[in-house]
Regions:
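Histidine/acidic-residue-rich, glycine-tolerant segments that coordinate divalent metal ions
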Residues: 1-105, 189-190
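Metal-dependent amide/peptide-bond hydrolase catalytic core
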Residues: 66-209
């Protein structure tokens, strides 16, 4: 992706970047400009408990699945603390939930994605989610391992580029002024966000040619 290309110096002599996606827009509109997107952090989570026979001696086990369930409920309870302006999204799946129904699950694994509109918002939401995960493990008496990785940074469109693009579209293609969606904020993410943190960038969506 663009992060690796950036790391290797592929953008060292580039002053600005424009990215275009094709999309059916409708409602008489043909192009979106001023597109801003969320950034995200990914988490690989492992809850570690202790196996035991689920019928004979469940009291001897430490149920990792219960830790994960509590952690998810903790995350849900946190949602009202996420500010609307940050467009926070927390998505989670259990990728490994135990081996046998007759055995108290000793290891449960999850994948989590935390999205937000700003870097500060990403860090704040990520910290809260980690707290929720740790609380789930603590309540049952087990352990949790959290491996955080930065995905994409938030996409911040350069408004001057957007204005210039619109002006040229109207002049050279005959586009109508009201055919543009001028503020398109999405909770999705794009690797163009990383570039937008260091140079002027623009991300447009347009219908077919």
């Amino acid at each position: 992706g663009k992060q690796e290309y950036l790391k290797r110096g592929g953008f060292d002599d580039v002053d600005m970047a424009l990215q275009c996606h094709m999309m059916e827009i409708g409602n008489g509109r043909h192009c979106t400009i001023d597109t801003d997107c969320n950034g995200f952090v990914t988490k690989t989570v492992t809850f570690i408990g202790e196996a035991a026979h689920a019928g004979f001696a469940p009291h001897e086990g430490i149920n990792a699945l219960n830790m994960a369930e509590l952690a998810l409920n903790n995350i849900h309870a946190l949602r009202e603390t996420f500010q609307e302006k940050e467009k926070v999204r927390v998505s989670a799946i259990i990728t490994e939930g135990g081996d046998l129904v007759n055995v108290v699950p000793a290891v449960v694994k999850m994948q989590i994605m935390v999205r937000a509109f700003t870097i500060d918002g990403m860090l704040d939401a990520s910290k809260k989610v980690n707290r929720a995960l740790k609380a789930g493990a603590l309540a049952i008496g087990g352990k949790v391992e959290i491996d955080d990785k930065i995905g994409y940074l938030p996409m911040n469109t350069n408004r001057e580029l957007s204005a210039l693009y619109k002006e040229n579209m109207i002049e050279y293609t005959g586009a109508e002024k009201d055919s543009f969606v001028e503020l398109y904020e999405t909770a999705g993410s794009t690797d163009l966000g990383d570039l937008s943190q260091i140079m002027p960038c623009m991300h447009i969506w347009t219908e077919g040619i």
